[in-house]
Amino acid sequence: MALRFPRFSQGLAQDPTTRRIWFGIATAHDFESHDDITEERLYQNIFASHFGQLAIIFLWTSGNLFHVAWQGNFESWVQDPLHVRPIAHAIWDPHFGQPAVEAFTRGGALGPVNIAYSGVYQWWYTIGLRTNEDLYTGALFLLFLSTISLIAGWLHLQPKWKPSVSWFKNAESRLNHHLSGLFGVSSLAWTGHLVHVAIPASRGEYVRWNNFLDVLPHPQGLGPLFTGQWNLYAQNPDSSSHLFGTSQGAGTAILTLLGGFHPQTQSLWLTDMAHHHLAIAFIFLVAGHMYRTNFGIGHSMKDLLDAHIPPGGRLGRGHKGLYDTINNSLHFQLGLALASLGVITSLVAQHMYSLPAYAFIAQDFTTQAALYTHHQYIAGFIMTGAFAHGAIFFIRDYSPEQNEDNVLARMLDHKEAIISHLSWASLFLGFHTLGLYVHNDVMLAFGTPEKQILIEPIFAQWIQSAHGKTSYGFDVLLSSTNGPAFNAGRSIWLPGWLNAVNENSNSLFLTIGPGDFLVHHAIALGLHTTTLILVKGALDARGSKLMPDKKDFGYSFPCDGPGRGGTCDISAWDAFYLAVFWMLNTIGWVTFYWHWKHITLWQGNVSQFNESSTYLMGWLRDYLWLNSSQLINGYNPFGMNSLSVWAWMFLFGHLVWATGFMFLISWRGYWQELIETLAWAHERTPLANLIRWRDKPVALSIVQARLVGLAHFSVGYIFTYAAFLIASTSGKFG
C-alpha cells in the first residue's frame, strides 16, 4: 500500500477513488505541495530537471539532422534550393495503397516522403553545411551533448554535487553568468562560426576541421584588429550580383553594415549578421561584468532596487522590498522569464518573415507561413503562462509587510482602476470594430459597396513612411531625400534598406489600407481582452470585493458554495482558463490576416485582400472557404493526392476540437451518473466482471474537466488551422 501512486502525497495515495490518479498527475510537477519538500530540495529538483530538458532538446535536434541526412535530399537541394523540395523524412506506410505511394513520392525521392516546412534546410545551408556527412557529424555532436546533459542532471542530484540554496539565490553571480557566460560568449562563438565557416561557404570555400587553421577568413588576418583599422573588415563586400555558395561576385569583407537583402537569396547579408552578433557579444560581455560578486566591485541588485524611489513620491517607496520578494519567489521569477520569452517568441515570428535571415527561405512560402504561425501560437501559450505564475506568486509568495507601499503594493491598491480601464478599452474596440465590419457586410449584401465605411490607416502609413517607404507620398524622415536622417545614412546601410523597403517582392512594410485598419483593431480587441482577463485574474488572486479571503482557497478552487452571492468562475485558475480561449481566438485572427495578405501578395492579386477584407463575409468566403477547397479534395471519388494527409488532419482536428465541448458544456452530475451506470453494467456482465479495479470510479472535478476540455479545444483548433495553412499554401505554390 505504501508504494501506491502518487509517492509524493500520502494523502492522495490513500484516496479510495480514481481522483487519486487524476490529482496525482495534476500535482506531479507542483513540487511545493509535495510531502517532505524543503526549500533546498525544491531548488535542487528544478535545477536538475533543467539538464533533462536540455537533453531532450539536444536529442530532438539531433534527430532532425539524422533523419534528413539518412532519408532527406539535402545534397541535391543545395544544388538548386529554389526548385528542389526539401524532404523531412520517409513515410514507411503511406495511406492508402498505390495512389498514396505515387502521391507522396516527390522531391526526387525513390519512395514516399514528407516535405520539410520547418526551414531547417535553409538554416543549415546558410550556416555553411553542404553535405550529408556534415549533417551526420552535427547529429552525433548533439547526441554527445544530450548525453553530457543527462550525466550533469544525474550528477547534480547526488549529495556531493547538490548546490545549496544560497548558491541559487546569488542573483549577481547568476546575472553575470547568464549575461557574459551564456549570451556574451555564445554570441561571440556564433560570430566566430559565421566568419570562419558560414561566410567562406557562401563564397564557395569549404572550411572544416582539417583546414580551418590554414584558411584566413579575411585577407589581412588579425592585422586590422590590432592596428585599430577595423573599417578594413567592411571593405569589398559581396556584390549585388553575388551567387550565394559560389565565388562569383563574392567579396572579402567579414563585418559589414550594408542594409537590406542579398538580391539572389532575398535574405539578410551574412556579413551584416556576423557584425550584429559581434556587437551583441560585446554588449553582453560588458553587461556580465557589472554586478558585484567576489571582488567587491560593481552593482548590488539590492542596493539598485532600494535606490529606485521616484522623488515625486507618486510611486510611494518605489522598488523597496522587491529584491527579496523576487529572489525568494520562484513563481515571480518564472513569470518574468515567461513574459520576456513570450514577447521574444512573438518578435521572432514577426522578424523571421519580414527580415529573413536564411538563404532562399523567403521564396519558400509554405515554410514562411508555417514558421510564422508556429511562433505566434507558442508565444500565446508562453505569455498566458506568465500571468498564471504571476497569480500563483500573489497567492503563495506575496508578503504585504515586505512590500508595503512599493510598486507591487500600489498595483494591488489601484487594481480597480487598471481593470476598469482595460475593460473600457476592450469594449470600445469590440463594439466599434464589429460595428464597422457589420455595417460593411450589410452594404455589400444590399449591393451598395460604395457605402462601406473605409478608413485609411494614415498614422501607420506615416510610420512606414518615416522608415523610408515612399509610395504613400508623405515625404518624412527616411522617405524625404533632403532630410538629415537620409543624408547621415546615405553612405552605409541606407541604400540597401530603402531598396528593400520599397521593393514589392518581400514582406518588409507591406502596403496597408482599410482592410488592414479593421483587422488591426480586431486583433487589438483580442489582445486587450486577453490581457484584461489575465490581469484581473492575477490582481484578484488574493481576494476581491466579493471574496476577500480568496487567497486561503488557493489557485484553482472551483467555487465556495452558494454563499456570498455565488463564487464560481472567480479563482485565478478560472481567469487563466478563460484567457486561453481568447488567446487562441486572437492568434487565429493574427494568422488569418498574415496568411491571407501573403497569399494574395505571392499570387500577385493583392486587390482580392484589399477588396474582400473590409467585411466579415469577405473573410469567410474569400479566405476560409476559398482556401479550404483543395484541402477538402485531398480525398474524393476519383482517388487522392498529396494533400490527403492534411485533409485527414483537418477532419481529425475538427473532431478533437468538437470533443472539447463535451467536457466544457456539461456538469459533473451527468458524468457521475453515467459512470455509476457503466460500472454497474460492468460488474453484472459475465467475463467482464472478472476484471475489477481498486479505485471507485468518480467523475472528474469541475476544474479537471475544464482542463481536459480546454486541452482538446486548443489541440483541435491548432491541428485544424495547421492543416488548412500548410495544405492551402503548398497546394498553390508547391
Swiss-Prot record:
Principal location listed in the UniProt entry: plastid
Protein localization: Plastid, Chloroplast thylakoid membrane
Membrane topology note: Multi-pass membrane protein
Subunit structure: The PsaA/B heterodimer binds the P700 chlorophyll special pair and subsequent electron acceptors. PSI consists of a core antenna complex that captures photons, and an electron transfer chain that converts photonic excitation into a charge separation. The eukaryotic PSI reaction center is composed of at least 11 subunits.
Residues in coiled coil: none
A Gene Ontology biological process term: photosynthesis
Binding site residues for phylloquinone: 671
Cellular component terms (Gene Ontology): chloroplast thylakoid membrane; photosystem I
Binding site residues for [4Fe-4S] cluster: 559, 568
Cofactor note (record): P700 is a chlorophyll a/chlorophyll a' dimer, A0 is one or more chlorophyll a, A1 is one or both phylloquinones and FX is a shared 4Fe-4S iron-sulfur center.
The keyword Repeat belongs to this UniProt entry's keyword annotation: no
UniProt-listed PROSITE patterns: PHOTOSYSTEM_I_PSAAB (PS00419)
Enzyme Commission number(s) from the entry: 1.97.1.12
Family: Belongs to the PsaA/PsaB family.
HAMAP family xref list: PSI_PsaB
MF-aspect GO terms: 4 iron, 4 sulfur cluster binding; chlorophyll binding; electron transfer activity; magnesium ion binding; oxidoreductase activity
UniProt keywords, alphabetically: 4Fe-4S, Chlorophyll, Chloroplast, Chromophore, Electron transport, Iron, Iron-sulfur, Magnesium, Membrane, Metal-binding, Oxidoreductase, Photosynthesis, Photosystem I, Plastid, Thylakoid, Transmembrane, Transmembrane helix, Transport
Name of the coding gene: psaB
Protein name in UniProt: Photosystem I P700 chlorophyll a apoprotein A2
